[in-house]
Amino acid sequence: MAIENKVQLVEALFDKLDIEINSFKSNTHLHCLSGCGKCCTKPDIDASPLEFLPWAFHLFLNSQAEEMLKELANKTNTNCQLYRPLSLIDGNFGNCSNYKYRGLICRLFGNAASRDKYGELRLATCKIIKENHQERHRGGRKCIKNNIFMVS
């Protein structure tokens, strides 16, 4: 399969997911705190090459791939490559430099469920959302429990 076709398939999947994510958000009103980028600084977040294929292809088409390879080779921190902190002092606040091309993990975090060790669905979110949006977090858990997390 040609690379263009793979990129189109990933982008089509992301478009469908965005519809479902927006539906979940409209039911729960859950969202990341404005400017929070704490998860973008965690070195143990797993992401696959496939979920960043559209971004890599975008870099290639815009003659930025070589420059990015050099940047990656000289990188000294473990932040997500797309993350741009607002401050050198507190790297936990910032934003995605290319939101359209963010990975699947970035799209789903806080807006999806995963199975716990008992096989039960649980809201996949962070401590910051749990503490700052307690009522909404409870609502999100309720939506998941009642299967109100998928578009019909």
Predicted ranges, named:
Residues 1-38, 42, 46-152:
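Short loop/turn segments that flank or connect secondary-structure elements
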